[in-house]
Amino acid sequence: MRLPREIGPIHFVGIGGIGMSGIAEVLCNLGYTVQGSDASESANVSRLREKGIQIHVGHKADNVAGADVLVVSTAIKRDNPELLAARAQRIPVVRRAEMLAELMRLKSCVAIAGTHGKTTTTSMVAALLDAGDFDPTVINGGIINAYGTNARLGAGDWMVVEADESDGTFLKLPADVAIVTNVDPEHLDHFKTFDAVQDAFRNFVENVPFYGFAVMCIDHPVVQALVGKIEDRRIITYGENPQADARLLELKPSGSGSTFKVAFRDRKAGTAHEIAELMLPMPGRHNALNATAAIAVAHELGLSDDTIRKALAAFGGVRRRFTKTGDWNGVTIIDDYGHHPVEIAAVLKAARQSTDGRVIAVVQPHRFTRLQSLFEEFCTCFNDADSVIVADVYPAGEAPIQGIDRDHFVLGLRAHGHRNVIPLQDSASLAGVVAGVAKSGDYVVCLGAGNITQWAYALPGELKALGG
C-alpha cells in the first residue's frame, strides 16, 4: 500500500526548514493538500505560500485542526503545542524521514549520505540525470541554483534525495542506489559513539536491495573500512585511491573550477573505460570527489560520456556552497555552509587554489557542543587561512558552555600558531574589520551554518558604503 491520494491535509510543523520544505513542495506538486507552520517568516515559507500552501507563523494547537497527519522533524520538541494537540486528537504523527520514505516508494531512488558533501553531491546527481532525460524528482538539503529551490517533481521514474544521518532516521529510506561520501565523528548527541555512527552507515548500505548498488569513497579510511565489512551488496568504490573502481585522475585547478578525468574499472568483467576532459565549475578536491560519485552513478545508469561531460561543465552549484556574494576593490566575498572542521579545511583549501591573493576566513562557530567536542580539530582546520576573524558562537538553541566561546576559540587558534586571529565584536563591525585586512586579490570566506550567510550577502554593500 502506498500513500493514499485522498489523504490530507498533511500538516508540517516547522515547514520552513530546508528538509521539511522540500518534502512539502513535492507533495503539493503531486496534488496533496499541504499546510504547515513555522516559528518565523523565511524565503522557504514565502516560496511555499506562492504554491498555495497555507502556513501559520507561530505554533498553536488550533493550527492542526482538520489535519489527517502531522509531519515533524527532530527539531520539534515533545511539548510543541501542535504535536500535543495532534496526539490528543489521535492524529497520526510521522517523522520527516518517514514521509520522505513514502515519497521514495513511488520511484526508483538514489540516496546520498555522508558527513560532508551530501547536498552538493545530490545536486550533481540530479543535474546529470536531468541532462540524461531522466527527469528526476529531487529533494535536497540546499537550494539548487538551477532550480531556485531545493525540490522539484519530475515526470521520470527516478528520485534523487539527500539522506540526513543526523538522527539515524536515514535508515528508513528505501534507496535503490546509495552514495556514501565520508563518515566522520558528528551528531554524537544522537549516536553517542563513533562506532554507532559507523554501524548506521553500514546498515544504510546493506539496506540497498540486491539489484541496486552503493557508491562509496575509499579515499576516506573509515569508508574504506566499511567497504571491507559489506559482503553481500554490490559496491562501486571511488576516489583518487589506485584501488578505486571509479578513479579520479589528473585533477588540476582551472580558473574558478577544476579539470580532471575519471577512469572506470569493472573488476567482474575485466574491462576499463575512461571519461577524459571533464570540467567542473567549482574549485576544490572535495568537489571533484563529489562529482566523481555522481559520475559513477550516471555511468552505471547508462548516461553517455558526452552527456556527463556537458552536464558537469554546466553545473550551476548550490546556494551556500562556495557561493560568491559580491566583490569590493578586487576582494571576492564567498559564503559557505562549512561548519565542521573537515568542511572548513576543504573550503579554505579550495579558496587557496582559487586565488594568488590571501585567504581571510570569517567563522561563526555553530553550536557550543560541536565546538567543545571538536575543539582541537577546529584549532587546526584554518591552516589555509592567512587571517581568521572569529564571531560569537551561534547557539542553535543550545545553552552556553563555560569555557567554550569566541574568546577561548581565539586563544586556541593563537596557541596553535595562527598569527592573525581577530575576535569580532558583532556583525556590524565586520565590514570595518575586513576593510582593514583585505587587499585586492584576496578571498574573504564566510563560514558557518548560522546567520552568517546574511552577513556574507550584506558585506559587499557595507564595504562599498565605507568608501575607499
UniProtKB/Swiss-Prot annotation:
Record's keyword annotation contains Repeat: no
- Where's it found, cell-wise? Cytoplasm
Reaction equation(s) it catalyzes: UDP-N-acetyl-alpha-D-muramate + L-alanine + ATP = UDP-N-acetyl-alpha-D-muramoyl-L-alanine + ADP + phosphate + H(+)
So what EC number does this one have?
6.3.2.8
Subcellular location, principal: cytoplasm
Q: Pathway, according to UniProt?
A: Cell wall biogenesis; peptidoglycan biosynthesis
Q: Which Gene3D superfamilies match?
A: Mur ligase, C-terminal domain, Mur-like, catalytic domain, NAD(P)-binding Rossmann-like Domain
Q: Which family does it belong to?
A: Belongs to the MurCDEF family.
Q: What is this protein called?
A: UDP-N-acetylmuramate--L-alanine ligase
This chain's source organism reads: Rhodopseudomonas palustris (strain HaA2)
